[in-house]
């Protein structure tokens, strides 16, 4: 066998490209002589040998043929193991490809013919014309040998040809068995050589992902599943669900339970969640699962199959019920030293502004006080103390009663409810503080207390159902504000619980001819939240009948929009399941028909990133309509809802919203800021911030109000200094306009929400999981903001409290095996996407080291900076249980 050529030697290097590009000359002899002069001796020898083999292959003597083929095969194999440039033997055999092919046709079937097929198959790698798939054709009639020995590039090329051939055979309905045998070989080869992504791509092309389960092993299953889960985002349904199913099975096979649980939650498959619990035997791990379920916000009952011991089961159910949330949040607050209560004035920072604005604001107007109530509630949310509502009543500076009465009628509702927000997640203390309002004779105060009870219980489940016990009796009272307080309270406290007792109480209201429209609207919303994403037929029927019973005048009312929204929430993220209901909605009155259609479509595909639905919604937004058509608002919001699931979609959506601002009609421009607010919620991107800042000075006050609220949403819970500065300047710019000033105040409250410890983002677990209840709360607020004047600036401002459904601490808190806080060093930095990269790349960049508990901003990831402990969850967010590492040695 000739020695292989050193790639740097002059002969090889100079001719590398030339040889492959030259057009055959008229006088082959002359050309050959010229070419031979340029080759080094080794190359020349190789070339002559190969030419000799080609002649010998055509020799009638089978012995000679066999020897020649064997030598040729050796030459090719020796050179194809590395594929940086076209290997020499392939280059020199180019002119003879046709000759060999023609001779191959004439050979009788024998082992020698198969041998030649193998060689032709490799030559076809560089020679065959596009779309001929010759490499594959020769491979299929060649020997059954190991394909890997011909090198990586060859296998890769084969995989590409198989995909094309498969599609062709599928359309002709021909047999694919021979292809599948080859696929088996290729997948095995790829999985052995760290090319999991290519193996997965091939299996997706031939629609046989189940093969993966046989080929994954301990070394590559994580990389394989990572690739599968990130690819699922870009696949059309139902393929995406299938891919996730496979990765769930792989995780279960290797007992990687936390990851399997995440996929089970993503698929919203209770059977899978149960399976994770029953398969895992480690109680500590089960506790970690419970924290994950609690963060996701679904109602989940453990049974004796999942946890055998009664005491253990009770302890675990407590974690699922989120009873530990308040305690963990306050631990974080103490650690960061932000327990000191803040007043609205601390947030407004009016002293930083020029004189004229701050002087005008000293007037004690009801609208200003209402704004201060909300700011106070958002900023001190969950801390259990503030300076307006929880002051002891005998203090000289003014008591909680005083602040309550600084608000006018319906303002008192929001003020009383704000006490629930301040006591957020601390059920016992919250209920005892709200108790005094139940004895009031003032209906708005009772309504606020009822709503407050709902807020305190938000996301916290309790066996004795205090919220239902307290609120159930008030649903059928005379006064509609009290009824709304009770209904909204139930909707917030039981969101996602699918509680039938409450359905039996609320459904009759929808079909009660005497009930006022606002009560019906809120009942529909609450039912939508309690049954969010459940596709419950009975609730859907009740809401549909309620919509059909509305008169022309009622359909024009701003609150009517909550009926289709309640209906949409039932199908949140459930894709095709909405189609039957969408058909029914086409029979509604034309005033509401399109609005309903857009709302259903956008809810059903929320967070799926479905490109076709984005196109449908864009088409709706492109129409230039008469005044009075309101369905484009939800279509614009729908764009954001569908596209928000992954970064690429978000960036594309931001660009198309920019276009809409330039070319869209007025009603579209009003919704665009809200859509931007949803896309970047609690994630203040500078470009979006600048767009909203520009829109906040728009001549159309509706656009300006939407933009201001959205500035609050994108900065929610971040304490972002730049947004805070913008809002301060806006407060002096709009100091004469009460409505706009109210919006500025609300936005200021949102930016400083929870003193910077909370987030409104419905995504968690590194943006993989979307919490349905959180999204429901945000979307409800955004739909209300499509028509600000009658709702948020009218007497239904307490709709703002729906945001509590999305409020979550943006913390990472490590606890020991007894669930007591444990401080360990962690690195926090920008998350890096490492899917499909070789080796073990760093997963975070630009990190700082802190000791836990720590705050995580949008797009940040944490990793432990010590080997002393092993975290029980691969994703460090929320509550993380640490187990001591038995192999750790102190240095």
Swiss-Prot record:
Q: What induces it?
A: By salicylic acid (SA). Repressed by drought.
Q: Record's InterPro entries?
A: 26S_Psome_Rpn1, ARM-like, ARM-type_fold, Proteasome/cyclosome_rpt, RPN1_C, RPN1_N
Q: Per the record, what is one GO cellular component? A: plasmodesma
Short sequence motif Nuclear localization signal: positions: 14-21
The organs and tissues expressing this protein are described as: Expressed in stems, leaves, buds, flowers, siliques and developing seeds.
**Where exactly is the Glycyl lysine isopeptide (Lys-Gly) (interchain with G-Cter in ubiquitin) cross-link placed along the chain?**
218
What name has this protein been given in UniProt? Answer: 26S proteasome non-ATPase regulatory subunit 2 homolog A
This chain is encoded by the gene named RPN1A
């Amino acid at each position: 066998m000739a020695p292989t050529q050193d790639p740097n030697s002059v002969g090889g290097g100079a001719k590398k490209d030339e040889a492959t590009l030259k057009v055959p000359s008229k006088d082959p002899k002359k050309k050959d002589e010229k070419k031979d002069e340029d080759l080094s001796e080794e190359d020349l020898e190789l070339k002559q040998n190969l030419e000799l083999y080609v002649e010998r292959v055509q020799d009638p003597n089978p012995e000679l043929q066999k020897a020649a083929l064997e030598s040729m095969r050796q030459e090719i194999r020796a050179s194809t193991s590395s594929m940086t440039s076209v290997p020499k033997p392939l280059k020199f055999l180019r002119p003879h490809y046709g000759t060999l092919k023609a001779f191959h046709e004439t050979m009788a079937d024998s082992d020698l013919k198969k041998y030649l097929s193998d060689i032709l198959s490799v030559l076809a790698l560089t020679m065959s014309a596009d779309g001929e798939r010759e490499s594959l054709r020769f491979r299929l009639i060649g020997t059954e040998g190991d394909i890997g020995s011909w090198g990586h590039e060859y296998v890769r090329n084969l995989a590409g040809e198989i995909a094309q051939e498969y599609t062709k055979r599928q359309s002709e309905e021909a047999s694919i068995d021979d292809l599948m045998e080859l696929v088996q070989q290729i997948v095995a080869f790829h999985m052995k050589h760290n090319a999991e992504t290519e193996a997965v791509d091939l299996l997706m092309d031939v629609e046989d992902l189940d093969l993966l389960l046989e080929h994954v092993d301990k070394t590559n299953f994580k990389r394989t599943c990572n690739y599968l889960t990130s690819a699922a985002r870009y696949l059309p349904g139902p393929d995406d669900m299938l891919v996730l199913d496979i990765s769930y099975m792989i995780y279960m096979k290797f007992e990687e339970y936390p990851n399997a649980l995440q996929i089970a939650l993503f698929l919203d498959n209770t059977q899978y969640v149960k399976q994770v619990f029953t398969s895992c035997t480690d109680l500590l791990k089960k506790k970690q699962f419970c924290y994950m379920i609690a963060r996701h916000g679904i109602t989940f009952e453990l049974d004796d199959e999942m946890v055998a011991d009664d005491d253990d089961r009770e302890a675990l159910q407590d974690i699922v019920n989120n009873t530990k949330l308040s305690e963990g949040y306050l631990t974080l607050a103490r650690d960061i030293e932000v327990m000191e209560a803040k007043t609205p004035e601390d947030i407004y920072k009016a002293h930083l502004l020029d004189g004229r604005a701050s002087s005008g604001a000293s007037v004690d107007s009801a609208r200003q006080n209402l704004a201060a109530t909300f700011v106070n509630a958002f900023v001190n949310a969950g801390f259990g103390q503030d300076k307006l509502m929880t002051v002891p009543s005998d203090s000289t500076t003014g008591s909680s009663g005083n602040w309550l009465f600084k608000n006018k009628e319906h303002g008192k509702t929001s003020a009383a409810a704000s006490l629930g927000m301040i006591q957020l997640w601390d059920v016992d203390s919250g209920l005892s503080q709200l108790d005094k309002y139940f004895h009031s004779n003032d209906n708005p105060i009772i309504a606020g207390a009822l709503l407050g009870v709902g807020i305190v219980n938000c996301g916290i489940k309790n066996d004795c159902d205090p919220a239902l016990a307290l609120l159930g009796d008030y649903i059928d009272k005379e006064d509609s504000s009290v009824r709304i307080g009770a209904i909204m309270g139930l909707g917030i406290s039981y969101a996602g619980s699918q509680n039938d007792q409450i359905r039996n109480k609320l459904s009759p209201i929808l079909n009660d001819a005497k009930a006022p429209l606002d009560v019906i609207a809120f009942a529909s919303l609450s039912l939508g939240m309690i049954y969010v994403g459940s596709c419950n037929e009975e609730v859907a029927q009740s809401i549909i009948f309620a919509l059909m019973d509305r008169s022309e005048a009622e359909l024009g009312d701003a609150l009517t929009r909550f009926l289709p929204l309640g209906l949409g929430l039932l199908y949140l993220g459930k894709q095709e399941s909405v189609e039957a209901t969408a058909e029914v909605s086409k029979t509604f009155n034309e005033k509401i028909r399109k609005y309903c259609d857009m709302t259903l479509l956008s809810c059903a595909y929320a967070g799926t990133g479905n490109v076709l639905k984005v196109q449908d919604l864009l088409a709706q937004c492109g129409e230039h309509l008469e005044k009075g058509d309101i369905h484009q608002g939800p279509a614009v919001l729908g764009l954001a809802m569908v596209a928000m699931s992954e970064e690429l979609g978000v960036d594309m959506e931001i660009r198309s919203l920019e276009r809409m601002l330039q070319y869209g009609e007025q009603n579209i421009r009003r919704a665009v800021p809200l859509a931007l607010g949803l896309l970047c919620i609690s994630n203040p991107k500078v470009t979006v911030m600048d767009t909203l800042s520009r829109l906040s000075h728009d001549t159309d006050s509706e656009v300006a109000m939407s933009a201001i609220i959205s500035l609050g949403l994108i900065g929610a819970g971040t304490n972002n200094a730049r947004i805070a500065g913008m809002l301060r300047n806006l407060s002096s710019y709009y100091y004469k306009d009460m409505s706009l000033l109210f919006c500025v105040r609300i936005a200021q409250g949102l930016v400083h929400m929870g003193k910077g410890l909370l987030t409104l983002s419905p995504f968690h677990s590194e943006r993989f999981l979307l919490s349905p209840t959180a999204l429901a709360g945000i979307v409800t607020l955004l739909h209300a903001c499509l028509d600000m004047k009658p709702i948020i600036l009218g007497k239904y401002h307490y709709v703002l409290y729906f945001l509590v459904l999305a409020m979550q601490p943006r913390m990472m808190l490590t606890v020991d095996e007894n669930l007591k806080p444990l401080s360990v060093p962690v690195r926090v930095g920008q998350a890096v996407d490492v899917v499909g990269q070789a080796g073990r790349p760093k997963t975070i960049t630009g990190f700082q080291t802190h000791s836990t508990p720590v705050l995580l901003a949008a797009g940040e990831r944490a990793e432990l900076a010590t080997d002393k402990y092993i975290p029980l969850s691969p994703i460090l967010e929320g509550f993380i249980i640490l187990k001591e590492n038995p192999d750790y040695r102190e240095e």
